[in-house]
Design a protein with these regions (language model features):
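Transmembrane alpha-helical segments of polytopic membrane transport and secretion proteins
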Residues: 170-199
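Transmembrane alpha-helices
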Residues: 63, 96-128
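Cytoplasmic-entry segments and transmembrane alpha-helices of multi-pass inner-membrane transporters
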Residues: 13-45, 71-75
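Membrane-embedded alpha-helices of multi-pass transport/permease systems
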Residues: 9-13, 27, 56-85, 115-123, ...
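Short cytoplasmic-facing helical segments at TM-TM junctions of multi-pass membrane proteins
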Residues: 72-111
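Generic hydrophobic transmembrane alpha-helix motif, especially the helices
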Residues: 32-64
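Hydrophobic alpha-helical transmembrane segments of polytopic membrane proteins
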Residues: 137-174
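Transmembrane alpha-helix signature in integral membrane proteins
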Residues: 1-16
């Protein structure tokens, strides 16, 4: 849920600071500062205000997910070719239409890249969340640290967490590549080059 809330808040913020670029530096700096706080310290700070349990973990995941989502949304929107946007304006498109029909589709792969990073980070934070009473796979790791010969427990908790992170990373990386607008252009230019070589 933390990553979902971060998408709901972070993507509009990323779009907003891409339109008003003077605000990009303070917004990204604040998100960067949050990111520099160690996850276990952030959980401890929030635990004092919110108590033990999953809510504290969700809020922590939300805070750590903001930076990659805001930054990638901002970067994706800013890097859209101005000539394409000018062509849209020339066709009589409004600012909202350019955003919906040009900027967001062309920056979607970059935004998904931010979500991918946020999800991988979130998995690590959720595992640590067991230390403050949130029921996760990290429970098994904690049991292992408390037992005299806990290597089996630690591996039983750590391996599934690592596998989930790897699967999500590979899946979203594949989706990123599929949605990359430059992918088709690269493919076409390679085919063109091969045809020229044959001639």
């Amino acid at each position: 849920y933390g990553v979902l809330f971060a998408c709901i808040i972070g993507i509009p913020i990323g779009i907003f600071i891409a339109k008003y670029r003077r605000l990009s530096w303070p917004v990204i700096t604040i998100a960067n500062i949050i990111q520099t706080v160690p996850a276990i310290a952030m959980l401890a700070i929030l635990m004092l205000a919110m108590g033990l349990g999953p809510t504290t973990v969700v809020v922590t995941v939300f805070l750590y997910s903001l930076l990659p989502i805001i930054k990638n949304t901002y970067t994706g929107i800013v890097e859209v070719d101005e000539n394409i946007k000018d062509a849209g304006k020339g066709m009589g498109m409004t600012g909202n239409q350019i955003l919906r029909m040009i900027e967001l589709p062309l920056s979607l792969s970059v935004i998904i890249g931010g979500v991918r990073i946020a999800l991988v980070v979130a998995i690590g934070i959720v595992a640590i969340g067991s230390f403050i009473g949130a029921p996760t796979l990290g429970d098994i790791i904690i049991r292992g640290t408390n037992s005299t010969d806990g290597t089996t427990f630690i591996l039983a908790g750590a391996i599934p967490i690592a596998l989930i992170a790897i699967i999500i990373d590979i899946g979203l990386r594949y989706l990123e590549k599929r949605l990359d607008p430059t992918r088709k252009n690269k493919k076409d230019s390679m085919q063109e080059h091969q045809v020229q070589k044959l001639h």
